Curated annotation (Swiss-Prot):
Subcellular locations according to the entry: Cytoplasm, Cytoskeleton, Microtubule organizing center, Centrosome, Centriole; Nucleus
Family the entry assigns: Belongs to the AKNA family.
The entry's DNA-binding region: 1115-1123
GO cellular component terms, A-Z: centriole; centrosome; cytosol; fibrillar center; intracellular membrane-bounded organelle; membrane; microtubule; nucleoplasm
Compositional bias (Pro residues): 865-875
Protein name, entry field: Microtubule organization protein AKNA
Encoding gene per record: AKNA
Native source species: Homo sapiens
Spans annotated as Disordered: 1-394, 507-562, 659-682, 775-942, 977-1005, 1095-1165, 1180-1211, 1252-1329
GO molecular function: DNA binding
Feature: compositional bias, Acidic residues: 89-99, 778-792
Regions that span the bilayer: none
Organism ancestry: Eukaryota, Metazoa, Chordata, Craniata, Vertebrata
Keywords: Activator, Cytoplasm, Cytoskeleton, DNA-binding, Microtubule, Neurogenesis, Nucleus, Phosphoprotein, Transcription, Transcription regulation
UniProt function note: Centrosomal protein that plays a key role in cell delamination by regulating microtubule organization. Required for the delamination and retention of neural stem cells from the subventricular zone during neurogenesis. Also regulates the epithelial-to-mesenchymal transition in other epithelial cells. Acts by increasing centrosomal microtubule nucleation and recruiting nucleation factors and minus-end stabilizers, thereby destabilizing microtubules at the adherens junctions and mediating constriction of the apical endfoot.
Compositionally biased spans, kind Polar residues: 263-275, 879-891, 929-940, 983-999, 1303-1317
Amino acid sequence: MASSETEIRWAEPGLGKGPQRRRWAWAEDKRDVDRSSSQSWEEERLFPNATSPELLEDFRLAQQHLPPLEWDPHPQPDGHQDSESGETSGEEAEAEDVDSPASSHEPLAWLPQQGRQLDMTEEEPDGTLGSLEVEEAGESSSRLGYEAGLSLEGHGNTSPMALGHGQARGWVASGEQASGDKLSEHSEVNPSVELSPARSWSSGTVSLDHPSDSLDSTWEGETDGPQPTALAETLPEGPSHHLLSPDGRTGGSVARATPMEFQDSSAPPAQSPQHATDRWRRETTRFFCPQPKEHIWKQTKTSPKPLPSRFIGSISPLNPQPRPTRQGRPLPRQGATLAGRSSSNAPKYGRGQLNYPLPDFSKVGPRVRFPKDESYRPPKSRSHNRKPQAPARPLIFKSPAEIVQEVLLSSGEAALAKDTPPAHPITRVPQEFQTPEQATELVHQLQEDYHRLLTKYAEAENTIDQLRLGAKVNLFSDPPQPNHSIHTGMVPQGTKVLSFTIPQPRSAEWWPGPAEDPQASAASGWPSARGDLSPSSLTSMPTLGWLPENRDISEDQSSAEQTQALASQASQFLAKVESFERLIQAGRLMPQDQVKGFQRLKAAHAALEEEYLKACREQHPAQPLAGSKGTPGRFDPRRELEAEIYRLGSCLEELKEHIDQTQQEPEPPGSDSALDSTPALPCLHQPTHLPAPSGQAPMPAIKTSCPEPATTTAAASTGPCPLHVNVEVSSGNSEVEDRPQDPLARLRHKELQMEQVYHGLMERYLSVKSLPEAMRMEEEEEGEEEEEEEGGGDSLEVDGVAATPGKAEATRVLPRQCPVQAEKSHGAPLEEATEKMVSMKPPGFQASLARDGHMSGLGKAEAAPPGPGVPPHPPGTKSAASHQSSMTSLEGSGISERLPQKPLHRGGGPHLEETWMASPETDSGFVGSETSRVSPLTQTPEHRLSHISTAGTLAQPFAASVPRDGASYPKARGSLIPRRATEPSTPRSQAQRYLSSPSGPLRQRAPNFSLERTLAAEMAVPGSEFEGHKRISEQPLPNKTISPPPAPAPAAAPLPCGPTETIPSFLLTRAGRDQAICELQEEVSRLRLRLEDSLHQPLQGSPTRPASAFDRPARTRGRPADSPATWGSHYGSKSTERLPGEPRGEEQIVPPGRQRARSSSVPREVLRLSLSSESELPSLPLFSEKSKTTKDSPQAARDGKRGVGSAGWPDRVTFRGQYTGHEYHVLSPKAVPKGNGTVSCPHCRPIRTQDAGGAVTGDPLGPPPADTLQCPLCGQVGSPPEADGPGSATSGAEKATTRRKASSTPSPKQRSKQAGSSPRPPPGLWYLATAPPAPAPPAFAYISSVPIMPYPPAAVYYAPAGPTSAQPAAKWPPTASPPPARRHRHSIQLDLGDLEELNKALSRAVQAAESVRSTTRQMRSSLSADLRQAHSLRGSCLF
């Protein structure tokens, strides 16, 4: 059985069935023992199935030969097999009825007596027969082993023996016995399969380790039932009978007669339990060997066929082969057995006769005792059986893998091997693996490794599962609630924050509460930074935690409960939003904290929406969601909750806009304070800049970017506003950059971009509507740009008006280039203005700019006022504020306000679009760059581009220019002046673009401010205003016009920046805008005709008039050659606002006045609010100077206002924007004629127009030329306006207002200028684009359609001097006539009633725009919710 065990082992693993079994039989006595054991139980089987007498005889004969083999297998083989096959047999015995162990023990105890004798006696004969039978039985056993393996395999190793084979140990003697017993049982029981006999036979195969074993096994397979009888008969010998009795115990299921007989024959040795087991195996083997061999011989010889039939029933063909082999191979078997013993014994068992079991070695007990190899039961014994078969077993040494493969395949191959010569199987397995032990060891090792790997894999899986669970629980570093939400699977925010790829979990539960909490946790710094917000985030965290539960509970909850739960969540979320907003407003949160907090809130809101949608889906599973929030139904039937969620989303958007504005404002170098205040100021309404700036001009700017700044912030706020516009745009961009992780942020950014694009398109559309005017303005702007380029070196700094036309030109060009450059390139007057501005610049521009935003330029003007004669710092601050305000009020009011809004949307990108319009040449407005500047629509693209890029305030069509001029003017001055110097020749559009890009909000604001000034100057004088429009359009781009007059810049800066910015908040709606634009275009066309006439005729006069400094600088840059003198005067008049001396002398004289004028034209510097008041006051001095310079007392007064502070154009009428409440200054008819009168009136300011386009509007600074010239439109004399020119240009509207209002009210000079101006320009230049901020005391709420409209067409309304608030003009006188109104803005004379109508139309337009915006937001929210839904669904599926 040792061999059979081995073979069985091999067969089990599938190593080599026939040959391997054979080898095993040869290798060890264990095979013999196995044979005896398997014979005993096989005989039992055989006896049932086959004629036991024959089998016994064969076995006896074989056993007679066995003795030699007996010793060989007995000593070590038995032990070996006992150990290995003992394990296998033990396993098999276990697999079998543990009877085999019992029988093995008893047989062992009992076997020693007779078993050993029989062993000796049987082994000796079996030595002889063994050799023969070993060959035969080896072959037959190998074949039978194959067959048995096949049968066992065929049975699927169902039988214990199969198990034994599988274990490879059970196939040891005990394995064979047990298998024999059980196989007999199984063969009897399992025989249901065709292989059941084969199985018995395979169990016989186990015994086939020994030839007789194989025969017995075969017989047993068939003759299980008869075998006991046959064995009893054949084994009458005590051993057999004894064997039968013990084997009965051992066999258990097998008839015990066979075991007793076998035991009688193989019982002799009784040994220790192991020995007993071995003994039992041997006994079994003995019994097999003695009796089964006899039987084998008998059957093989006597009844070869009966044997096969007995053996296999269905496998009879296989049996017959083994039988003939056995018959023919008795001796060969002995030889084979000897060879097998020598080979297999030497290698492994090399002791006993491999093929015959020794009675002593029949101790199969170990099979039961050695379960250690249970796992390796694979039919190794069968493989061993094959070994025994392979007398010629040339081993092909193969790698263990190959051997194992063969062993595994051997079970299937065993049958074939049996059919074929056993040599084939032998060659397949190397000798080292021939032995069952080696094969078993190898298989054990492999299996152990496999189990080890399986264990590791299982551990890894468990670890992974645990990690997954743990990760779900601990996804968030913040509170455990996020983890809980993750568990719930609703942690979109948490996963997002933690960058976990668990989208579904977040979607599952995260959003309600944890979403915020993860937000808070994600922005850990934010909660702490925000204070209130931190608690809010904490509350949101609990809310989130609660939401997941709700989500789980929601299904169970009723619709009402769900609705209530969501409503509570929404209320909590709202409280958090409000707390966060308060924190932001309080300025307690850093920008990054704000962004983080907003992201968290956004995530929480998204989660809330998702929860709502989920609830809706649950409530209406079959109904598609009617809305983004889900279909109304039992759950939220009135969709109130949906509306609330939407409102929350809108609040978040506004908050985001405010945050963006706050973030963007810091970008401008000069709007630090504005930014600082801006964060404090929640520009939540920043989207609606018009409403935001509604207070003062600074307010619009501030509101847009930072409502907080006022006076100092007026410039700053003008700066911040444009800056904010830029900031907002940038903020949109930076927001996207800073919070790219927030999909909503991306969507918002896209929305902002789309809005910007939309605004840009609208601007272009409006510009296209006013294409003729735009072309004219472009031409004018080009001329102005040329002038600017020519006179770029001469142009004064950003705020200062060029002392000479050339300087003004340079200034115009430079503003878009760089304030500093312009400053450097400007001539002495420019230097003076620059000095003033510089004096303001380091402290003012830098400090004020940083403090006030772009008020720095104004601040320079502030500092400059003392130096240049501008009012002291109060005017300076206000002057800076006024100057900006003045510009803001004029340009800024409409442009800044409107632009800031749009810039927010398009500051980042649309302003580029604007750029084409930004260039005064490219987009001068309706009638040239001046008109473009004057006209927010026309200007807006160019200014707005600059503004958006610069400050974003100018982003609004006209307000853009103003913010750039006013809001960002200080910055523009600081940074823009260099550009002017550096880029005198740079096209305005380029300059603006450059400003926008290099200076960012600062330069952008500077151009805006320049535009504002220009607008103010243009607005100051209708004719001049038209030029101013050109200039403004030009200037806004270069901001050179504004920057040229540094000294008056403060006065000019205040000009329209604030109001303009305010007005431009929103040109309300397209319809209103279009209507207003059409009206403006019509009037502008009329004005254009007049201006063209004026421009051609009074170019000289215009040059004489500085044509408000702004207009003049822009034009001067555009066309320095057109009227250097005129420019000088225009610029001087604006310079008067900004810098001293229009031509240099007058401008220098005016500079103090001009700066004062700008200071006076507080609107500019004072940010719209201060514009009228303070800038006007400083403007009065400037205006006085200017008027002196201009020498036109009425116009000089107004132009002084204009000239003194173009920003505070005396001719302007101050209107209070109904939307923003900003004061907008329109040139009063009186103011228009004067320097600004020229600006407001193309005829009055033809030179300015030329200066802007062809240096036409030089009259404001121009001494008498502009005054001398009488605008056909305004009927004002051009020469006084020239002096005012700067003032009028600076504050075209202001001047108009100032002239009207302050023609007598401002300083006498200013008043005289204004008077002169106003008489000259048409009744009043209503500069829609430039709505002076509150600074100009607006008598009425005039909203320049242009300033309001962010679109290019800028319309200049000439209202009668009377109608246009003359009071503002009086107040505006301080507004040193801002740069002459940019090229002749297409001035439209509008009565207050017309203005009101326009206001109404614009208001409707704004309302429509707001409605569109809200609708867009709602759509975006719906789309976002749907997207989140889809993502969550996908995530849930994937998760």
